[in-house]
Amino acid sequence: QQRIAAFWERELVDRPVVQFHLSRPPEQCVPVPVSEHTSPEERWMDADYQARLALANLTNREFLGDSLPVAYPNLGPEVFSALYGCPLHFGDYGTSWTDPVLQDWRDIGSLHLDWSSRYLRALHAMTDAMLDVGRGKFIVGMTDWHSGGDALAALRDPQTLALDMIDHVAEIKQALGWL
């Protein structure tokens, strides 16, 4: 604990922080919950399943050095953009993606964070479920929000945003101020 606290202060106690984990031998592993979901979206959005999956995955790892078991709710890298209206699509395993919604810079004022979004509610439910099953077993972190430039790229489309960096610099700077 002292070493990690020193790390965040850019200090060194006795050695650098070393974090890595290994899979436990198969005979020491617990079964990973089997998904009975009918769609990838249903599986991604199931808070209890995601919490049980996190517990099994972390139980099946050995945390070495200064590593700590950490799980976080996850709906993919563009969930923040979905809170601003981008349709969110879920892949079978590993990632999700959105469709851009900002076709014209004049429409940026119509984008607002949806505090009642089902995705935000799902992240809250996952956080609560992970806190319940992880109590005394692992740390629960926050989702990776991908705000700022990542969110703007999803809202506008990455290739379009790249071209916008030539013709719409002021709009980009303004948008980054509130994303």
Where would I find each of the regions flagged by the language model?
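N-terminal basic, low-complexity leaders that serve as flexible interaction/assembly modules and, when applicable
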Residues: 1-91, 170
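Active-site-proximal, glycine-rich beta->alpha crossover segments in alpha/beta enzymes
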Residues: 78-179
